[in-house]
């Protein structure tokens, strides 16, 4: 997704609130609930690191499609430098969370990036699957998660 700030992350949680229950009680706002707010604040801090001018070049890179800054976790490592740069970004996030956050926001980016890089594998039985996964990868890299959410009218059908 285009790099976003912690404030954008928190706003997205509030605008597209999921139904969350703790001990049988509905949580009205995950961003302020005492059992969840510290995790939300930690994730927001990680997103803010993408805009920290001292390390922004280590946290983001320029998208080859949109020219926007996107998270380094989306980079498809084609060189040793690419892999090194991605490790630096992940190290920043691991240190910021003291290594205690097992699923930082980049884990799914890396998964989809790897699938897109293996497009030929997906094309073995159905050639269009290569285009599908590569187009999906570009879509999630270029669009913030709150812009990708399924509308409430559609969610009710699932």
Q: Which stretches of residues belong to each language-model region?
A:
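Acidic/polar, glycine-rich intrinsically disordered N-terminal extensions of enzymes
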Residues: 1-63
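Structural motif
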Residues: 19, 146-147
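Internal helix-loop-helix
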Residues: 48-146
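Conserved small/polar residues in nucleotide/adenosyl-binding loops
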Residues: 147-154
């Amino acid at each position: 997704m285009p790099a976003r700030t912690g404030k954008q992350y928190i706003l997205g949680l509030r605008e597209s609130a999921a139904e969350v229950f703790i001990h049988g009680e509905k949580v009205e706002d995950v961003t302020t609930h005492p059992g969840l707010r510290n995790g939300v604040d930690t994730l927001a801090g990680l997103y803010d690191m993408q805009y920290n001018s001292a390390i922004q070049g280590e946290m983001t890179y320029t998208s080859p499609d949109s020219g926007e800054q996107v998270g380094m976790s989306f980079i498809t490592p084609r060189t040793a430098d690419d892999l090194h740069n991605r490790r630096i970004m992940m190290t920043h996030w691991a240190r910021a969370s003291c290594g205690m956050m097992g699923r930082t926001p980049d884990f799914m980016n890396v998964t989809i990036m790897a699938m897109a890089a293996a497009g030929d594998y997906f094309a073995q039985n159905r050639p269009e699957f290569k285009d599908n996964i590569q187009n999906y990868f570009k879509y999630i890299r270029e669009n913030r998660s709150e812009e990708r959410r399924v509308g409430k009218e559609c969610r009710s059908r699932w």
